[in-house]
Amino acid sequence: MYLYDGIAGIVLFLAKYLDRYQDSSCRQDVEKIYKLAIEKLEKYTDLRCEQNEVPEPLATGLYDGESSIVYVYLILYEITGQEKWIKNAQKHFEIVAKLLPKDENMDYLSGNAGAIVAAMKLYQLTGEIEYCTAAVETEKDLWKKGQRMEVGYGWKLKNLKYPLSGLSHGNSGFLMAYVELYKMTYDQEYLKKIKLLLSYEDILYSEDLKNWIDLRDPDGRKTMRGWCHGAPGILLSRMSIMDILPDDKQIKKDILRAVSTLFHNER
């Protein structure tokens, strides 16, 4: 059902297609599929809201969790301007709110780091303080679950010896949450935490491999060039940080590193 590999992702793709290609020869067919996908997504929201107890385990994350549905509704609002999507997002966030204290995933993909991003976007678009409060309180609990490293800070996820680099499960994903918190609150504590997360992730960059090491590999010599792990996702996080630290030399250096890695071996 989620954005990463389910109906929500299909809805978003079709919505962007319909917005971009107004005169497409297959528009009518796409609209039919889009309508069916929307109906399924809204029925899912209704079903979850009707349940007195939210079944476990349900993930909270922005891509592979309940927050992904909130996020897609909000993007639909930005595309169409229709208030119904804001209402749907608020309705579905009621489900997310029940799950926040139970989260064990923590990361951007499936956990509360991603949920914070959804909550802050909801706050940005509605101005309703309850969503900012939910994000702020969730961050407090999230930070307590992390570990101060010899350099910087990170989160050791299940069955892992060290915190990871990267967007899905690593510091780049957590950085996305802290950037949104700082952008909407200007709380200097978030900026300090951003710098700690950057410090740890940057020590995982290998000059030899020209990429950030994937510590899921016991030998510590594996790298990836995917959205989830490696330079592409890290590039996205650094670009988001440029909004708040436009003159930071290390951020600019990381962006150049990531771009170079992304197009390595391209002719």
Task: Identify what each model region corresponds to.
Residues 1-267:
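Glycan-recognition and catalytic cores of secretory/periplasmic carbohydrate-active enzymes
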